[in-house]
A protein has these predicted regions:
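Conserved Rossmann-fold NAD(P)-dependent oxidoreductase catalytic core, especially the SDR/UDP-sugar
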Residues: 1-45, 65
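A structural motif corresponding to the C-terminal end of an alpha-helix
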Residues: 2-11, 49-63, 227
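Conserved beta-loop-beta element that borders a ligand/cofactor-binding pocket
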Residues: 16-17, 52-81
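Conserved loop-to-helix N-cap of the C-terminal "lid" that shapes the substrate pocket in Rossmann-like
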Residues: 66, 110-123, 139, 150
Length: 253
């Protein structure tokens, strides 16, 4: 309503959705999830957003596209839903306490298939869908393009922190970390970190939710590849690179 009257040369509207479209928050869902899979009950706000935009575009000279990423990770502070930053802080605190690196989530999920997308790759996909005719008026799944299991990448995270790996130990992370603010303040001083309070960096309750399911999470990228998208990033290498960026920017030691 606000844009159309003033943007007389409007060409494209980009909608950012997510795998919640498929009901990931409801429990087990069909995998690999395809863009044309039946919607779950109940409908969620992603469905309402796309339906509204699609109807609004009908007969207009501009186009729309929607991306459905899953697990968007990238360098940031103050993000309430940044899983890797939370894991990085958990690892750093465990090391400060002289503990091995233990998987803190559901033991079943430790071996499940998982996926995510680097935020830099997501930005590239947004540009691609906005400027590619074959992508106009379509919704696409988007991830790094590969899959992994936490049990396979966990040793790489241990190597990054120079920590031994111990058996998984499911915990309520938020309950265990709620009293670590003073410890983090000391770490900031000792290691010369950016002067952020722990609660400014990580939302432990989000980690509780994200790491405590027991389902494969997998999206089909067939549709976007057939439309011409070609980029695939190695998720294990991306994890190490993002951890290093947190260290380089003095967020973690």
């Amino acid at each position: 309503d606000a844009v159309e009257p003033v943007a007389t040369e409007l060409q494209h509207v980009q909608l950012m959705l997510g795998a919640k479209w498929y009901g990931t928050y409801l429990g087990s869902y069909k995998t690999p999830a395809r863009e044309d899979d039946p919607r779950p009950l109940p409908k969620n706000f992603y469905h309402a957003q796309q339906d509204w935009l699609e109807a609004r575009q009908s007969g207009k000279p501009w186009s729309w596209s929607a991306l459905r990423p899953h697990g968007v990770w990238g360098f940031s502070t103050g993000s309430a839903m940044n899983l890797l930053t939370g894991i990085a802080c958990y690892g750093a605190i465990s090391k400060e306490l002289g503990l091995p690196l233990r998987w803190p989530g559901n033991t079943g999920f430790f071996g499940r298939l998982y996926q995510f997308i680097d935020v830099d790759l997501l930005a590239r996909a947004m540009m691609w869908t906005a400027t590619t005719p074959a992508a106009a008026n379509n919704a696409f799944n988007i991830t790094n393009g590969d899959l992994f299991r936490w049990q396979d990448v966990w040793p790489r995270i241990g190597d990054f922190f120079d920590m031994p790996i111990a058996d998984p130990q499911p915990i309520a992370i938020s309950a265990q970390m709620d009293d670590k603010s003073a410890l983090w303040e000391g770490m900031v001083e000792r290691h010369g970190l950016q002067p952020y309070a722990l609660e400014q960096i990580v939302n432990w309750r989000y980690l509780d939710m994200a790491l405590n399911n027991d389902i494969d999470q997998m999206s089909s990228l067939t549709k976007i590849f057939q439309a011409g998208w070609t980029e695939v990033w190695d998720s294990e290498a991306t994890i190490t690179r993002q951890l290093q960026k947190l260290r380089d920017n003095k967020i973690i030691p």
